[in-house]
Amino acid sequence: MPTDHEQPCGPRHRSFCLNGGICYVIPTIPSPFCRCIENYTGARCEEVFLPSSSIPSESNLSAAFVVLAVLLTLTIAALCFLCRKGHLQRASSVQCEISLVETNNTRTRHSHREH
Protein backbone atom coordinates (compact mmCIF):
# COMPACT_ATOMS: atom_id res chain seq x y z
CA MET A 1 0.00 0.00 0.00
CA PRO A 2 1.36 3.39 -0.87
CA THR A 3 2.09 5.86 1.90
CA ASP A 4 1.26 9.57 1.73
CA HIS A 5 4.53 10.26 -0.09
CA GLU A 6 4.34 7.40 -2.57
CA GLN A 7 2.59 7.55 -5.90
CA PRO A 8 2.03 4.81 -8.48
CA CYS A 9 4.47 4.91 -11.35
CA GLY A 10 3.43 6.65 -14.54
CA PRO A 11 3.35 4.97 -17.95
CA ARG A 12 7.09 5.54 -18.34
CA HIS A 13 7.92 3.11 -15.47
CA ARG A 14 4.95 0.69 -15.62
CA SER A 15 7.16 -2.28 -16.59
CA PHE A 16 9.96 -1.37 -14.17
CA CYS A 17 8.98 -3.99 -11.56
CA LEU A 18 9.23 -7.67 -12.44
CA ASN A 19 7.35 -10.78 -11.29
CA GLY A 20 4.15 -8.95 -10.36
CA GLY A 21 5.83 -6.24 -8.27
CA ILE A 22 4.03 -2.89 -7.94
CA CYS A 23 5.91 0.21 -9.04
CA TYR A 24 5.90 3.37 -6.92
CA VAL A 25 7.69 6.68 -7.04
CA ILE A 26 8.42 9.26 -4.39
CA PRO A 27 8.31 12.74 -5.90
CA THR A 28 11.55 13.82 -4.24
CA ILE A 29 13.48 10.75 -5.49
CA PRO A 30 14.02 10.45 -9.26
CA SER A 31 14.11 6.64 -9.57
CA PRO A 32 11.12 4.33 -8.99
CA PHE A 33 11.02 1.48 -6.47
CA CYS A 34 9.02 -1.72 -6.20
CA ARG A 35 6.82 -3.44 -3.68
CA CYS A 36 7.35 -7.11 -4.37
CA ILE A 37 4.77 -9.83 -4.05
CA GLU A 38 5.37 -12.81 -1.78
CA ASN A 39 8.48 -14.92 -2.54
CA TYR A 40 10.21 -12.18 -4.57
CA THR A 41 12.78 -9.61 -3.51
CA GLY A 42 15.32 -7.20 -4.98
CA ALA A 43 15.19 -3.63 -6.28
CA ARG A 44 12.99 -4.74 -9.21
CA CYS A 45 11.56 -7.96 -7.64
CA GLU A 46 13.98 -9.89 -9.83
CA GLU A 47 15.14 -12.38 -7.19
CA VAL A 48 13.20 -15.35 -5.90
CA PHE A 49 13.13 -15.26 -2.11
CA LEU A 50 13.79 -18.71 -0.68
CA PRO A 51 12.83 -19.25 2.95
CA SER A 52 15.81 -19.76 5.22
CA SER A 53 16.82 -23.38 5.60
CA SER A 54 17.77 -22.67 9.21
CA ILE A 55 14.08 -22.77 10.13
CA PRO A 56 13.01 -26.40 9.89
CA SER A 57 9.80 -26.95 7.98
CA GLU A 58 7.04 -29.25 9.18
CA SER A 59 7.96 -31.90 6.59
CA ASN A 60 11.62 -31.82 7.71
CA LEU A 61 10.56 -32.31 11.33
CA SER A 62 8.29 -35.19 10.35
CA ALA A 63 11.07 -36.87 8.39
CA ALA A 64 13.49 -36.44 11.29
CA PHE A 65 10.94 -37.95 13.68
CA VAL A 66 10.42 -40.98 11.41
CA VAL A 67 14.17 -41.55 11.08
CA LEU A 68 14.61 -41.25 14.85
CA ALA A 69 11.75 -43.70 15.50
CA VAL A 70 13.22 -46.25 13.05
CA LEU A 71 16.69 -45.96 14.59
CA LEU A 72 15.26 -46.34 18.09
CA THR A 73 13.26 -49.41 17.03
CA LEU A 74 16.31 -51.01 15.40
CA THR A 75 18.43 -50.32 18.50
CA ILE A 76 15.85 -51.89 20.80
CA ALA A 77 15.47 -54.90 18.48
CA ALA A 78 19.26 -55.38 18.39
CA LEU A 79 19.49 -55.18 22.18
CA CYS A 80 16.68 -57.72 22.57
CA PHE A 81 18.37 -60.05 20.08
CA LEU A 82 21.72 -59.77 21.85
CA CYS A 83 20.15 -60.33 25.26
CA ARG A 84 18.30 -63.42 24.04
CA LYS A 85 21.39 -64.76 22.33
CA GLY A 86 23.44 -64.15 25.46
CA HIS A 87 20.72 -65.72 27.61
CA LEU A 88 20.62 -68.85 25.45
CA GLN A 89 24.39 -69.19 25.67
CA ARG A 90 24.28 -68.80 29.45
CA ALA A 91 21.50 -71.37 29.71
CA SER A 92 23.51 -73.84 27.59
CA SER A 93 26.61 -73.39 29.72
CA VAL A 94 24.57 -73.90 32.90
CA GLN A 95 23.13 -77.12 31.43
CA CYS A 96 26.65 -78.26 30.54
CA GLU A 97 27.82 -77.56 34.07
CA ILE A 98 24.86 -79.50 35.47
CA SER A 99 25.67 -82.43 33.14
CA LEU A 100 29.29 -82.38 34.26
CA VAL A 101 28.27 -82.33 37.90
CA GLU A 102 25.84 -85.21 37.34
CA THR A 103 28.50 -87.16 35.44
CA ASN A 104 31.04 -86.56 38.22
CA ASN A 105 28.49 -87.56 40.86
CA THR A 106 27.67 -90.73 38.93
CA ARG A 107 31.35 -91.62 38.62
CA THR A 108 31.89 -90.92 42.29
CA ARG A 109 29.00 -93.21 43.23
CA HIS A 110 30.27 -95.94 40.93
CA SER A 111 33.80 -95.67 42.28
CA HIS A 112 32.50 -95.90 45.88
CA ARG A 113 30.55 -99.05 44.98
CA GLU A 114 33.57 -100.66 43.36
CA HIS A 115 35.67 -100.28 46.50
Swiss-Prot record:
Q: Which domain of life is it from?
A: Eukaryota
Residues on Extracellular side: 1-62
Going by the UniProt annotation, this protein carries glycans at: N39, N60
Q: Could you tell me which Gene3D superfamilies the record lists for this protein?
A: Laminin
GO MF, any single term: growth factor activity
Q: Name one GO biological process term.
A: ERBB4-ERBB4 signaling pathway
Q: In which tissues is it expressed?
A: Highly expressed in pancreas; weakly expressed in muscle.
Mind telling me which PROSITE patterns this protein's record contains?
EGF_1, EGF_3
Record family assignment: Belongs to the neuregulin family.
Note on domains (UniProt): The cytoplasmic domain may be involved in the regulation of trafficking and proteolytic processing. Regulation of the proteolytic processing involves initial intracellular domain dimerization.
Question: Know the name of this protein?
Answer: Pro-neuregulin-4, membrane-bound isoform
What gene is this protein translated from?
Answer: Nrg4
